[in-house]
Swiss-Prot record:
Protein keywords: ATP-binding, Cytoplasm, Kinase, NAD, NADP, Nucleotide-binding, Transferase
Principal location: cytoplasm
Pfam family, one: NAD_kinase
Catalytic activity entry: NAD(+) + ATP = ADP + NADP(+) + H(+)
EC code: 2.7.1.23
Catalytic residue list: D64
UniProt entry tagged with the keyword RNA-binding: no
Cofactor(s) needed for function: a divalent metal cation
Protein name: NAD kinase
Family note: Belongs to the NAD kinase family.
Gene source species: Nitratidesulfovibrio vulgaris (strain ATCC 29579 / DSM 644 / CCUG 34227 / NCIMB 8303 / VKM B-1760 / Hildenborough)
Length: 299
């Protein structure tokens, strides 16, 4: 990509530290000939998309939650994002707050490199009419309301019936979201570069539905068969839709829907270790090779 000439900074709303840091970064960028605009909180999708259209980079100051909100509103625009971590986990917002200057210096010194990932695009249909459409960065979760009851769902893939499912819920996740709710439900970890998404049940009745990986171009349709129980769809853990019996949610991959600036540091495995998703238990195995006398070592 071309060198960065303009930056849009989006801060976590109601976070004075983020706003102060944004002002410091804005001054730093201006002194280097980069135009800068600061926005407190992502707000509505349309104004954010309009502001981001003129930016070579969107810098997000906050935690992974703030990154999710901004990335979801900018899904499909192709505008690269970079997160400065002011939160806890920092899997999406990967730049430590104390390293922002060195990081930006590196980004300005060479053409920007980006990593494109799959997002989810979904629609909710009621009575044959689409009542909602949206995108998801991490996942769409279909689950019960306040009462501890299983729900019944009908699942089709590419127009073909897959199964009826009785479970606490269902998680449809992108590779980016595989380290979120899905992994807690024993879904697989996925390389973010994969053109695929997962369908993972939450506590399936009798355990008769293993996690499923679908190609990014597949269409997964979920019909709510439950009556008399509250059912909701939650998008990235941040937005919710109340569902009724007979409603149908249709989901598919949005290729290149997410765009992140890359720093060329540690890879995916390093991030998994750093964030505690895998543990490296070093051990020394006994020598199993035959000794000079032709006998093997007993263990």
């Amino acid at each position: 990509m071309h060198p960065i000439r303009s930056v849009l900074i989006v801060t976590k709303p109601g976070h004075p530290t983020a706003l102060d840091l944004a002002q410091d970064i804005g001054v730093w960028l201006t002194r280097r000939g980069v135009s800068c605009r600061i926005l407190e909180g992502p707000g509505e999708a349309l104004p954010l998309r309009q502001l981001a259209a003129d930016a070579g980079l969107v810098l997000v100051l906050g935690g992974d939650g703030t990154m999710l909100g901004v990335a979801r509103r900018l899904a499909g625009t192709g505008v690269p994002l970079l997160g400065i971590n002011l939160g806890r986990v920092g899997f999406l917002a990967e730049v430590p707050a104390g390293e922002w200057a060195a990081t930006l210096e590196r980004l300005l010194a060479a053409p920007l490199r980006v990593e494109r990932r799959l997002a989810l695009r979904f629609g909710v249909e009621r009575g044959g009419v689409e009542i909602f459409q949206g995108d998801a960065v991490n996942d769409v979760v279909i689950n019960r309301g306040a009462l501890a009851r299983v729900i019944t769902l009908d699942i089709d893939v590419d127009g073909e019936r897959l199964a009826g499912l009785r479970a606490d819920g269902l998680i449809i996740s992108t590779p980016t979201g595989a380290t979120g709710y899905a992994v807690s439900a024993r879904g697989p970890l996925m390389d973010p570069a994969l053109d695929a998404f997962t369908v993972t049940p939450i506590c399936p009745f009798l355990g008769n539905f293993p996690p499923l990986v679908l190609g990014g171009g597949s269409v997964c349709s979920v019909r709510i068969r439950e009556q008399g129980t509250e059912v909701h769809a939650t998008i990235d853990g941040q937005e919710g839709i109340a569902l009724r019996s007979g409603d149908r949610i249709t989901l598919t991959g949005l290729r290149d829907g997410l765009c992140f600036a890359t720093l060329g540091g540690g890879g995916y495995c390093a991030r998994l270790r750093a964030c505690g998703f895998v543990r490296d238990h070093a051990c020394t195995l006994p020598d199993m090779l035959p000794d000079e006398g032709g006998t093997s070592t007993d263990v």
